[in-house]
Amino acid sequence: MENISPALLEWFYKNRRSLPFREDPTPYHVWLSEVMLQQTRVSAVLPYYYRFLEELPDIPALAACEEERLHKLWEGLGYYSRVRNLQKAAKLVCAQYGGQLPADYAALRALPGIGEYTAGAIASISFGLPVPAVDGNVLRVFSRLYNDPGVITEPAVKKAFTARVMEHQPPEKAGDYNQALMELGALVCVPNGAPLCGQCPLAEVCLARAAGTTAQLPQKAKPKPRKIVPVTLALVESPAGFLVQQRPQKGLLAGLWQPVLWEGEHLLQAEVLARLAALGLDTGTAAPAALPAAKHIFTHIEWLMSGVQLHVPVQSAPAGYVWASREQLRTTYTLPGAFRAYKPLLL
């Protein structure tokens, strides 16, 4: 196949979106944007990106930020392990590299939370290094370009595709080339069997288009079935606020805050009241109101939630819990998106 970079770059320079991390592609800006964009659309990321940089404009500020504030700045983006790894890496960068990301692919790759793709994006876009940056968009483009039925989630297939990506990369324009492939996958060679081939600068050399197989590519492994977990919530409110507790520092939703809940079972109202009493809580005489059922899908787990809302008298919080006002829930305590259906009741 002829080299695709001239046609690809010509298209990119005419059609690329104006994005803040492209207009000012410092290593920190590219790093932050790539981490935020994992599992999240550009349009959803931009408000968070601006807000995050306004408060944490550089790597030393990120390294010094208190964890609770860091979670609050990330609230709504989900996948909070991303921002925890971001801070771990920032602390190492401050300790080892004077607060500046190293201009070296292997050194970037060694930092917490920075995988092959993110390291490649930083190294090529910010430092101009001729390295690959292969994400799902790029894999989809090359799967169709070469009409390759390989399962793109398999390491050997990804390695082969990466080699093909590098065959076409102009070393002096590595960053632009990598971004152009990502942009092509995001805007034209889109997923779900509906590529906009009429707008594609590579249409004339695309083997899947010639074979009529674009709708079947790329091939992906069948997803594993999610584990279904019943969850019972209790939105307990007193004049002091809502009763909340912090989740453990490791595991699902680590370090975030939640209402009273019990994972693994759906409880009747009487059972909820008995459990609250066992915590030492005076539930008063007001009858609880049933919460609407809701669900939240994690990567491999699906929560099916139900529960109650009730008002209780003024009292001390049970051990391990705190009373949080609506204002504190808005500004201080980070509630994960898993409770999105109930946030209007809490905020």
Name what the model sees in each region.
Residues 2, 6-198, 202-211, 215, ...:
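Catalytic cores of DNA base-excision repair glycosylases
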Residues 1-18, 23, 186-347:
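Intrinsically disordered, low-complexity, charged terminal extensions of DNA damage-control enzymes
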